Amino acid sequence: MLQTLISKFLGSRNNKLIKHYLKEVQAINALESTYNTLSDAQLQEAFMQLRKLIQNGETSLQSILHKSFAITREASKRVLGMRHFDVQLIGGMALNDGRIAEMKTGEGKTLVATLAVCLNALCGRGVHVVTVNDYLANRDAKELEPLYNFLGFEVGIITSEVRDDNERLQAYACDIVYGTNNEFGFDYLRDNMKYDLSQKVQGEHYFAIIDEVDSILIDEARTPLIISGPVNRTLEHYQLANSVAQRLKNEEDFSIDEKNRVILLNEEGIKKAESLFKVDNLYSIENAALSHHLDQALKANYLFIKDKDYVVQNDEVVIVDEFTGRLSEGRRFSEGLHQAIEAKEKVDIKEESQTLADITFQNYFRLYEKLSGMTGTAQTEASEFLQIYNLEVVSIPTNVPVQRKDLNDLIYKSEKEKFNAVIDKIQELYKKGQPVLVGTASIEKSEILHELLKKHRIPHTVLNAKQHTKEAEIIKDAGVKGAVTIATNMAGRGVDIKINDEIRELGGLYIIGTERHESRRIDNQLRGRAGRQGDPGISQFYLSLEDSLLRIFGSDKIKGIMERLGLKEGEHIESGLVTRSVESAQKKVENLHFESRKHLLEYDDVANEQRKAVYKLRNELLDENCSLQERISTNRELTAQSMLYKAQILPGDDSSNFNIDSLKAQINEELGLEIGNCENLDYDELLEKLITQMNTAYEEKMSKLEESQRAQIERIIYLQVLDSSWREHLYTMDNLKTGIGLRGYNQKDPLVEYKKESYNLFLEFVENLKFETTKMLQIIQLRDKEEEVANKMIKNLQDELEENLQDLNTNMDSTPVRKNKIARNDPCPCGSGKKYKVCHGKSGPKSGLLA
């Protein structure tokens, strides 16, 4: 009842929006006769006038929307030979209003984007169009560039092939930038690791339009973007844990929970593992690493399946994106799982990595002042878009009514029977000449179908992650007569399948789904490949009780029906009731995934506030006009207080109890200072003396430099310590996040505990930052030829920072690049001529987070 009321309300809300937009469409159409009589030069001049009005602040985007849309449509007609339909104008307005335009396949989403892009690009603040892969970013930018150029805009493209920072800088400087979600996100993280404001490439986050918005903001939202560096850990444990895991047996030694993707050892399994590892207690503190490696090895061997979750290519394990079926090059599983899979597959094991910078897609895209998106399937996740991103979904009517027939699911008892039925259907369609597109849920299943079709001598084409480079050509030809195409998940393909009149007579493209995906949206995308622009088409799913969705989440109702009917081999059941039961199983999984994404976001929101504060400070430090004098002075006072506290000298204590010898030794060790007579001084006098002496020593040293050199050294050292401390803080936060779930056993909310602990860790990080910067600045040694030494030192520091930045590998692991360690008796790299141990190596052991 409640659901009906909600759907009625939502339906009416959508209808109201469409009615409102239709009035706007009439106003845009009324201008068409005005603009189609203008010459090209006059049309360009009319658009240029709008640009001047906006940039001079004389009008708003909303007030010139009708003119901008009408001019863009006229320009598109002349330059691209394509005129925007009325429904496309509605889509453009939804995008401009910061909404998600749900438009069916073949409705021309790529062209719709031009309307909102051109209007918002008039501000001169940059518009980012985000796509799911490099192919689509290149294709869309190049196809639409003539239109944008005609209207006076420059277009930039950001893909994984653009490695040079100068090229990226030029691309981002353009009015309109096309690129992938990963590249935009990583550029943001890399920008916040740069040591010069002029090297930052991305600029401001004004307006973004996300193509295939559900794929990026929903499917990929569980995967954070991570820039990482190596952690030196021994690799033998992975091989040992793998051999132990392979000797343990399912059900006898452990149980598998497929729903939650967890493997639990039983008593027998623990005893066997302890015997194989030759340890007394697998779960003691000293064996914590072994138990962790065993957990990951069990997952690698019994939960992660080759050619479904990953492929082995060129002696490397490459992840397969479960939603798009594409290879996720450069991405790695975290927490040692990737290494466990490498051990299982007997390929080179790469080192584990430590997070240097990270952000989730949710928090990256929420940086934009205005955000919108387009997709063929968004209504099933409308509530999530609204809750997480504050994005409303508008279903745009189709230009021509959809003619496709969506038949009920056919359910078989076993997978073998299901595949035989699919082959029979393909044979029937192939003889008729009707093209068929077969969707599979994994590479493994597409290979099974491939072998069966070869056996029956039916010519066909396979599109899965292994052939992703040829996907556009394969999909384009899927609508020709007699074509049989097998494809893993069709999400985000972005290529239309066009058919001719002969195929229309045969009934159009026939879609066969061999398994229901965990998300209804992916199934709808597969169905949506047929019936574009009013073409005929048919879609039907073939399922079996052995499919993972039905096995893990399916209700007993379906199994009960099958048993009562007493079906013989090869027979199936087909009814609306069964189809609805399958959809209810999908809803269960979607809710699970939603909770998982929400959970990830709740945790990342905590880190996000800290990230914003650190990046804000970093940007202030990068500003050459930033003066650190006051900050350094305050930090010096706090450091002096910290030194007294470490020596157990506290305010209000009697001076006869002060351990002055301990204080002197500590100050000499940490700051390289000799302090004079401190006997009989009270706390305040002692603190004042220490601050004065630190200040005198510092000013005496720095006064030999020019003001600009001094400021630059202070800024670079501050940045160096900030980055080092932030890396350590992220590492500590990672460790905290890994174990925080266990607090639930103590009747405590893990999220509340995480917030408390991370806040305390952040306070510790801030204190350490202040102490370490003061210490570093105090121990800098400047000798003769001050200017030359200072310049050399600045250059050395900058070179080291740049080298560190270049050594970082994007995402989760890569072969580490090791820097040579400076021996204690080597000359100090600062150029002082002293040995390292008595110059910059003198600072003593690091403490706290920097240990």
Swiss-Prot record:
Cofactor (UniProt): Zn(2+)
InterPro entries (alphabetical): Helicase_ATP-bd (IPR014001), Helicase_C-like (IPR001650), P-loop_NTPase (IPR027417), SEC_C_motif (IPR004027), SecA (IPR000185), SecA_DEAD (IPR011115), SecA_motor_DEAD (IPR014018), SecA_preprotein_X-link_dom (IPR011130)
Enzyme Commission identifier(s): 7.4.2.8
Note accompanying the cofactor annotation: May bind 1 zinc ion per subunit.
GO molecular function per UniProt: ATP binding; metal ion binding; protein-exporting ATPase activity
Catalytically driven reaction(s): ATP + H2O + cellular proteinSide 1 = ADP + phosphate + cellular proteinSide 2
Statement: the UniProt record of this protein carries the keyword Protein transport: yes
Residue sites binding ATP per the record: 88, 106-110, 496
Topology in the lipid bilayer: Peripheral membrane protein
Keywords: ATP-binding, Cell inner membrane, Cell membrane, Cytoplasm, Membrane, Metal-binding, Nucleotide-binding, Protein transport, Translocase, Translocation, Transport, Zinc
One of the GO BP terms on file: protein targeting
Cell compartments where the protein resides: Cell inner membrane; Cytoplasm
Binding positions (Zn(2+)): 828, 830, 839-840
Enzyme class: translocase
GO cellular component, one term: plasma membrane
Subunit structure comment from the entry: Monomer and homodimer. Part of the essential Sec protein translocation apparatus which comprises SecA, SecYEG and auxiliary proteins SecDF-YajC and YidC.
Known role: Part of the Sec protein translocase complex. Interacts with the SecYEG preprotein conducting channel. Has a central role in coupling the hydrolysis of ATP to the transfer of proteins into and across the cell membrane, serving as an ATP-driven molecular motor driving the stepwise translocation of polypeptide chains across the membrane.
NCBIfam families per record: PRK09200.1 (NF006630), PRK12904.1 (NF009538), secA (TIGR00963)
Family: Belongs to the SecA family.
Name of this protein: Protein translocase subunit SecA
Source organism: Helicobacter hepaticus (strain ATCC 51449 / 3B1)
